[in-house]
């Protein structure tokens, strides 16, 4: 199931822009203090670092990801998720716009 709408959150209106605009996101804060981000990655191959563990939920498009220390690229599409350990890196390869929700912690 793909998340299509998020209700009852505070949205930071200033966008987070990374990699010369290849990734753009906005921060969400839930009433209980939970933080997430929602964004899009445009066609590119990028490397992201994590502080906290992350779950990347694909809500549109698709991507391939490669976790730090592995050789395999894994494809995910709308309605699928992948987990990234904290204090690590992952590569993401996108050939069409990849829309996501990033769940932290």
Swiss-Prot record:
Q: Record's InterPro entries?
A: Ppnp, RmlC-like_jellyroll, RmlC_Cupin_sf
SUPFAM superfamilies of this UniProt entry? RmlC-like cupins
What name does this protein carry?
Answer: Pyrimidine/purine nucleoside phosphorylase
**EC number(s) on record?**
2.4.2.1, 2.4.2.2
| Positions in coiled-coil regions | none
List, in alphabetical order, the Gene Ontology terms for molecular function in this entry.
guanosine phosphorylase activity; purine-nucleoside phosphorylase activity; thymidine phosphorylase activity; uridine phosphorylase activity
EC category: transferase
**What is one term from the GO cellular component aspect held by the record?**
cytosol
The role this protein plays is: Catalyzes the phosphorolysis of diverse nucleosides, yielding D-ribose 1-phosphate and the respective free bases. Can use uridine, adenosine, guanosine, cytidine, thymidine, inosine and xanthosine as substrates. Also catalyzes the reverse reactions.
Annotated organism of origin: Acidovorax ebreus (strain TPSY)
The family line of this record is: Belongs to the nucleoside phosphorylase PpnP family.
* Keyword field contains Transferase: yes
Task: Tell me the classification of the organism that encodes this protein.
Answer: Bacteria, Pseudomonadati, Pseudomonadota, Betaproteobacteria, Burkholderiales
What CDD domains does this protein map onto? cupin_PpnP-like (cd20296)
A Pfam family that this protein carries is: Ppnp
Q: List the disulfide bonds.
A: none
The protein's annotated catalytic reaction(s) are: a purine D-ribonucleoside + phosphate = a purine nucleobase + alpha-D-ribose 1-phosphate; adenosine + phosphate = alpha-D-ribose 1-phosphate + adenine; cytidine + phosphate = cytosine + alpha-D-ribose 1-phosphate; guanosine + phosphate = alpha-D-ribose 1-phosphate + guanine
Q: Which UniProt keywords apply?
A: Glycosyltransferase, Transferase
Keyword Nucleotide-binding assigned to the entry: answer is no
């Amino acid at each position: 199931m793909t998340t299509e709408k998020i209700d009852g959150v505070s949205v930071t209106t200033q966008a987070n822009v990374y990699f010369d605009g290849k990734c753009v996101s906005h921060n969400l804060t839930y009433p209980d203090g939970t933080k997430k981000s929602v964004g899009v990655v445009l066609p590119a191959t990028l490397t992201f670092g994590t502080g906290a563990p992350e779950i990347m939920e694909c809500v549109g498009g698709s991507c391939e990801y490669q976790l730090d220390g592995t050789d395999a690229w894994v494809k995910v599409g709308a309605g699928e998720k992948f987990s990234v350990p904290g204090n690590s890196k992952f590569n993401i390869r996108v050939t069409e716009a990849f829309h996501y929700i990033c769940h932290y912690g």
